[in-house]
Every structure is written in structure tokens, then in C-alpha cells.
Amino acid sequence: KLANANIDELGQQALASNDNNQLNQDNLKSMVSREQKSSYQSLKVKKLEANSLVSTAEAKYLNLWQRQIESSGDRIILEDGILLEGQRVQIIATIDSLGNLIRSEIAFSSGVREIDLLAIKILNESAPFPAFDPLMIEEYGFIEIVRDWNFSSG
């Protein structure tokens, strides 16, 4: 019984040690996540919409971004062979100053799951985007682009 008690006791100690390690890892992940959110929130984000008044640097950036999205989108739509008849979806893309896609989401759904997933796929596969112009970097660290996409087969 004493040997079994020691084994059980060691087993419980090992289990407790593993639990403590897991808690420490969870706490560390939580702290890192909070720091990332805090870092993201502390930087300025410029929101660009379809009818935003934009500076020349922003207008050029949006033009480059749109051309890159359209090139990738045309290729992906051909590959996927999805029927696109007058589908509309509104997307939000958050991009950092290096051109990395930080977040992609659907603001307004098309109502067709395949189309919404296609829009997200196009965003993700189009990244990375061009880095910001130095003038843009002086003003903000991220841009949030809100766009309506109208899908059609033709």
C-alpha cells in the first residue's frame, strides 16, 4: 500500500505540475493576446470606404489594392467555377503598414455561403499587399478598407 500510495502521490504531483504548466502557458498566451490587442489598438487606424475622400497616397494605394484583388479574384473565380449571378457582398480588410492582411471579414453577407467564402478566399490569397507610402505611415499604422463587391458572370 505504501508503494502504491507513493506512486499515486507522485502521479498526483506530476498531474498538478502539468496543470500548473498548462495554467502558466494559458496565462502567457492570454498576456500575449492582450499585448497584441493593446498594440493594435494603440496604433492609428484609417478607415477607407468606397466614397471616402482620400489623399493622393491613399487613392494610389486603393487603386493598387483593387487591381491586385481583381487579378487574384479573376483567377480564383475561374478555378472555382462558381456561378456568380448578381451577387453582392461587403468586405472589410484590415492591412498593416507592411501590406500584411491582418483581418478579413464579411460586413454584409450576400446570403449565399459560397459567395461569402469566395470573397474571403480572394482577400486572403491576394495578400500580401504593397507596403504603405511613407506619408501614410506617418499618419497611421493600419488601414481598414470597406468595399462592396458585386460578383457577376460576365
Model segments located where?
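Short, small/polar residue-rich loop motifs at catalytic or cofactor-binding pockets
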Residues: L84-V89
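Conserved "boundary/linchpin" sites in short secondary-structure elements
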Residues: L15-E49, R67-G73, D96-F108, I120-G154
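Surface-exposed patches in mature extracellular/periplasmic domains of secreted proteins
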Residues: I77-I82, P134-L135
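A short, highly charged nucleic-acid-interacting micro-segment common to nuclease
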Residues: L48-A59
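Extracytoplasmic/secreted envelope proteins and their assembly/folding machinery
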Residues: N4, L62-Q66, E70, D116, ...
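A short acidic/small-residue loop/turn micro-motif
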Residues: F108-E114
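Short amphipathic alpha-helical segments with a strong bias for extreme N-terminal helices
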Residues: K1-S17
